[in-house]
Amino acid sequence: MTQVGQYIISNNSTSNLILHITKKLVSGESLFNLKQEEILIIQNVCTLMFSHGIQILLLRETLHNIGVSDLVVLNRKVPDEFWFKIFCMIKQRSGSEILKHIFSEENAAQLSKKLHHTGIVKQIIESFFLDEFGLSITIPAEIIHDGNIMFSIGAIYNHRLLKLCRYFNKFWGQEVYEPFIRKICKHLWFGYLIFFDKIKISHGAFSQQKPEHRNGLFTFIQNDFKVFCGIVEKEAKVTECNLSDLFSIGPLQF
């Protein structure tokens, strides 16, 4: 165990490269100045954290929807645009014949079983996350085989985490958006360090970082690491973009 902050201890298994990248991220170093291997590690970690976050959100919604058959209740958080996108994907993968039965109450249950059994539901869900958010994600079978899975996905469609994921993948590698992408990377990186036991946070951090503190625990921990290591953060670069782009971008185009 190595002390890397007043409230942070690094595990012995944590590599020097991980700590080296951490120092670069908190120093405000541009992502364009990092080595290729460092960039690849950061991108993979961010993708991993987005995937885990989405799976947790889907698990939450799946648990909420267990045993629920009331369509009004199931559809309470699902936007209409989500259903239109799913409709288009079903049409594209299954042909027009299936659309004759898709709105029939009598055939709905049988049709749902058929789509699950043939693997079309799995294909649609994986393609949906790739097309909309640029994320290749594997959802556990226990969740994907749930009868209300599409309602669960629709419920998180406009969640902030998915908006961040779309923003991250759409603007990754574009210099004008680099400061915001780096900020996302920094928070996801520290989430990775904590959740995957690369660093341990002492109980004192939670008493010092009070709920009313605006910046939150991750920023508190980042500042602790920065001060302990004697890192002076570089001045933020002024860019022409702003975070309002996060709420206006549509599906990704590759």
From Swiss-Prot:
Any single Pfam family the record assigns to this protein: Herpes_UL79
InterPro entries per UniProt: Herpes_UL79 (IPR004290)
Family: Belongs to the herpesviridae UL79 family.
Name assigned to this protein: Protein U52
Organism: Human herpesvirus 7 (strain JI)
Record lineage: Viruses, Duplodnaviria, Heunggongvirae, Peploviricota, Herviviricetes
Gene from which this protein is expressed: U52
